[in-house]
Amino acid sequence: MQRRHILHTAAALALIAMGQPVLAQNTFPNKPIKLVIAFPAGGPTDITMRSLADNAGKILGQPVIVENKPGAGGTLPAQQLQSAQADGYTVAQIPLGVFRIGYTTKINWDPVKDISYVINVTGYAFGIVVPADGPLKTWADFVAYAKANPGKLTYGSTGTLTSPHLTTELVAQKAGIQLQHVPYKGSADLMLAVVSGQLMAAADSTGFAPQVEAGKLRVLNTWGEKRLDKFPNAPTLKELGYDIVQNSPFGIGAPKGTPPDVVRRLHDAFKKAMEEPSYVASLARYDMLPNYLSSADYTKFAQDTVGREKVLIDKLGLAKPN
């Protein structure tokens, strides 16, 4: 009788233990979620992602707390996922730089296989700006100065190997000019540098909009398929003769092995958060638009993008030595 009681008790405990992951998933989340983003506070990424996080927190019933982790070309949040618990309580912004890091830096994780892709949310509107009172009034002026002064035209971006950096270098290669790149950690510091004259130009997302609207900066070009509504006089790269469109889509990832039910819960909450007018309005401030991809489509995007980024890295001669 005692032996039967022990067996029944052991079986019951085993069933309880087996049920714990399911219970955890069904009650997710029961504490705050951390969203790590790749750029500093006060810039367009920070402002728009905080709006998204605020909306998602209300939907999930738990706060989504933003943590800024700038540097390393926007790849630090993805690296943080490699040591985070796969429970959905740490998620991260995945900028395009994540898909090129393996070609330029020795890493011990795979950008496709070692991240659970939750949802793509938006992309950037980029351009090149110069001081409004400076000598460079048009893109033709920019190219002419750079050709006459090889390596002396300074421009900044939000970091080495970011999309603004690499796209500008690709344009420079096509234009036959040599520029001097100065990396910054975020848009706020970058804009201060170009407005104050420390730099001759900046390649950035439209975090430059307030400075342009204040008459301090001039937009020489933008990088979308069509001209931006805020800056209709600025030509696209395609109009200037470069077959380049860059909007650098980004979304949210979780650690590898995050339970599918948790990924689905996060996806559904962030998708609803994307549809809130407050988030759409925060994007519009920077000429950005919602750009939804489901978890499956975002995973496929990651796989395809890793291949495309290799072509760009090779073209610019930036691949790490074997």
Task: Please place each PLM-identified region on the residue numbering.
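N-terminal export leaders
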Residues: 3-8
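N-terminal (or domain-start) structured segment
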Residues: 24-114, 152, 176-203, 211, ...
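An extracytoplasmic/periplasmic, membrane-proximal ligand-sensing/linker region
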Residues: 30-32, 173-174, 260-322
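Hinge/capping helix and adjacent helix->loop/strand transition within the periplasmic-binding protein
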Residues: 80-89, 102-189, 237, 247-282
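Beta->alpha turn/N-cap motifs
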Residues: 92-98, 157, 187, 203-209, ...
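A ligand-binding cleft/hinge motif common to bilobed small-molecule-binding domains
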Residues: 97-106, 170-174, 201-232, 310
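C-terminal lobe and pocket-closing loops
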Residues: 123, 208-275, 304-307, 321
